[in-house]
A protein has these predicted regions:
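Short gly/pro/ser/thr-enriched loop/turn and capping motifs at secondary-structure boundaries
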Residues: 58-61, 124
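Acidic-and-aromatic substrate-binding clefts and catalytic sites of carbohydrate-active enzymes
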Residues: 2-6, 29-36, 94-100, 123-127
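C-terminal active-site rim and adjoining tail of enzyme catalytic domains
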Residues: 71-163
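Alpha-helix N-cap/helix-start and coil->helix boundary motif
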Residues: 32-35, 58, 154-155
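An active-site metal/cofactor-coordinating segment within enzyme catalytic domains
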Residues: 1-33, 40-43, 47-52, 56, ...
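A generic structural signal for well-ordered alpha-helical segments
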Residues: 42, 63, 108-109
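Hydrophobic packing residues within well-ordered alpha-helices of enzyme cores
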Residues: 38, 63, 157-160
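Acidic/glycine-enriched edge-of-secondary-structure segments
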Residues: 1-4, 61-68, 85-94
Length: 163
């Protein structure tokens, strides 16, 4: 729940710009109607390597109309991603069980989509075995920067995936 002591988005963007902005910025949208304000701040801080995700479907369609980089979601509950053709990527989530495999990732990459996988520890599960699998898939598909992982352990991930 946001409150008056939360870091303001503009302050976050200022901080982000002090780091390597070649890294993708995933913006998890939790309220409707933020498009105009967000677009202005992204342009002001010249942030281009980002994507928005997790908003309601009606709100997502407005983000698409405003030419944002929008990811759709695929999970064990959302087997067919919404607005797939209009999305630039797929946020792949495994809430309770491991279902993401090489063929699913390959399908999205062949369709020209970026892919971001939610790492298992974000759902209180062990991550090591799945990271091994994703590393193998990444090498086999030569996915490069088109395949990303969202993790609570970015330093461990950098060391593991880029050794």
């Amino acid at each position: 729940m946001a409150h008056e002591n939360c870091l303001k988005l503009e302050d976050f963007f200022k901080l982000y710009k002090t780091y390597d902005t070649n890294l993708p910025l995933a913006l998890n949208i939790k309220a409707d109607g933020l498009q105009t304000m967000l677009k202005q701040l992204l342009e002001k801080y010249q942030i281009f390597n980002y994507f928005v995700f997790d908003m309601s479907i009606p709100d997502a369609l407005i983000y698409i109309d405003f030419n944002f980089n929008v990811f759709t979601r695929q999970s064990e509950y959302e087997k067919k991603p919404s607005f797939y053709e209009k999305a630039c990527g797929v946020w792949m989530d495994e809430f309770y069980s491991h279902w993401i495999d090489k063929n699913t990732i390959k399908y999205h990459l062949q369709k020209g989509k970026l892919v971001c996988i939610v790492s298992p520890e974000l759902h209180k599960r062990s991550y090591q075995k799945e990271w091994q699998e994703y590393k193998k898939i990444d090498k086999e598909l030569k996915a490069g920067q088109r395949l990303m992982i969202c993790t609570d352990y970015p330093d461990k991930a950098k060391e593991f995936f880029y050794d």
